[in-house]
Amino acid sequence: MTGSVDRPDQNRGERSMKSPGLDLVRRTLDEARAAARARGQDAGRGRVASVASGRVAGRRRSWSGPGPDIRDPQPLGKAARELAKKRGWSVRVAEGMVLGQWSAVVGHQIAEHARPTALNDGVLSVIAESTAWATQLRIMQAQLLAKIAAAVGNDVVRSLKITGPAAPSWRKGPRHIAGRGPRDTYG
C-alpha cells in the first residue's frame, strides 16, 4: 500500500483537497477489484461501464422463437380462469356469473320478467314481475336449471326458489311465528 497516508508530511497541498476517507474508500475498492480479477471475474467500473457499453451485465436476452412459448402474451380471460382455478375460486366465480350475467345465462325474454336475488347453498332465489310469470317459471324450472348448468357448470345451482311480486306484508324475514290473532279494535 502506497500513498500519502503512510507519510503525512509529503504532498500536503494535494491532501488538503482530498479527504483521507475518500482515499481509504478508493484503496478498498481497488483491492476488491484486484481480488475479483484474481478470481477471474469481470472487475469493471460498475454501472458506468455497463451503461457506456449499451448492455446490462449478466445473461443475454434470449428470444422465444417462432413457436408458442410460456412467455408469450396470454388472453386476460384465460389468465383469470387459471388464477381462479389455482386459488380455488371457481365455484364462487360461477355463482357470481349466474347473478352478474343473468340475461346471457337464461335468455333476454326471461331476464326481462324475472331477476335473481340470491344464491345460497345451491338454491337460487328468483323474483318474477307477476304471478303469471312466476307460474310460468315454475313450470319450466327443469329447462332453466339445464340452461344454468350449461352456462356455468353442474352443481352450482341445484334448485330454484321462484316467488312472485311481494304483496304488502308486515312480516320481516323468511321465518315467522303466529301473532296474537284477531283483536278487538273498537275500543
UniProtKB/Swiss-Prot annotation:
Q: Where is this region: Disordered?
A: 1-75, 168-187
Q: Compositional bias (Basic and acidic residues) spans?
A: 1-17, 24-45
Coiled coil regions, renumbered to chain: none
- What InterPro entries would the database entry show? DciA-like (IPR007922), UPF0232_actinobac (IPR023007)
What is the top-level taxon of the source organism? Bacteria
Family, as annotated: Belongs to the UPF0232 family.
The protein's name: UPF0232 protein MRA_0004
Species this chain originates from:
Mycobacterium tuberculosis (strain ATCC 25177 / H37Ra)
